[in-house]
């Protein structure tokens, strides 16, 4: 039987989110006793928990989630473990040199996930404030290699979030960014990544 590994964090009402984002709310809307069936009402932004960034997140003329070819979210992938058997310290800079030993994996169209061990901090304030961070030089190094998808176990690629996202999502590069992954240490060297988003029209 094929082994499946869930790389996503659960979504719960009231859990910590990005400081400027709306809170997650999960409410009982109908019950069996009241109307004959149970129904929950879920309210959240498109960037809660494990999620992806479409180019439209940072560019008004960029593709929205529903416009991205589905093949971008599915296919052979590789994990780059930057902290084998452990976890990186808070705010560890991830430089181009961090990825150079794995340069042969960064081929055009490749799907690359990198592990820092920071998913252990999910649910704490530090998850958002102190995560290991791509340097802009590393972001350019990755963008220059024209990979198709970049995933990570941090909530955002870099503390220089605006410029880093611009480098990775700009026209002509448009790398799908998947943030807030977990359990990357369970992945084999090569695997099939499945990360289809909800078909949400005009979503970021």
Where are these regions (language model features)?
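Active-/binding-site microenvironments in catalytic and ligand-binding cores
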Residues: 1-204
């Amino acid at each position: 039987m094929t082994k499946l590994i869930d790389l996503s964090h659960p979504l719960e009402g009231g859990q910590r989110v990005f400081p400027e984002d709306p809170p997650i709310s999960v409410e009982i809307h109908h019950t069996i006793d009241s109307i004959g069936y149970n129904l929950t009402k879920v309210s959240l932004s498109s960037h809660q928990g494990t999620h992806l960034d479409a180019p439209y997140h940072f560019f008004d003329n960029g593709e929205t989630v529903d416009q991205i070819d589905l093949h971008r979210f599915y296919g052979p992938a590789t994990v780059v473990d930057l902290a084998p058997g452990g976890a990186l310290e808070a705010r560890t800079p991830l430089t181009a040199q961090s990825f150079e030993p794995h340069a042969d994996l960064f081929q055009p169209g490749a799907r690359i996930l990198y592990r820092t061990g920071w998913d252990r901090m999910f649910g704490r304030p530090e998850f958002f404030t102190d995560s290991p961070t791509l340097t802009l030089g590393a972001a350019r190094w990755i963008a220059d290699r024209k990979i198709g998808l970049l995933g990570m176990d941090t909530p955002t690629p870099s503390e220089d979030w605006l410029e880093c996202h611009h480098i990775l999502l700009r026209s002509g590069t448009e790398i799908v960014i998947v943030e807030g992954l977990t359990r990357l240490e369970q992945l084999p060297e090569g695997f099939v990544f499945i990360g289809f988003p909800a078909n949400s029209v005009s979503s970021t």
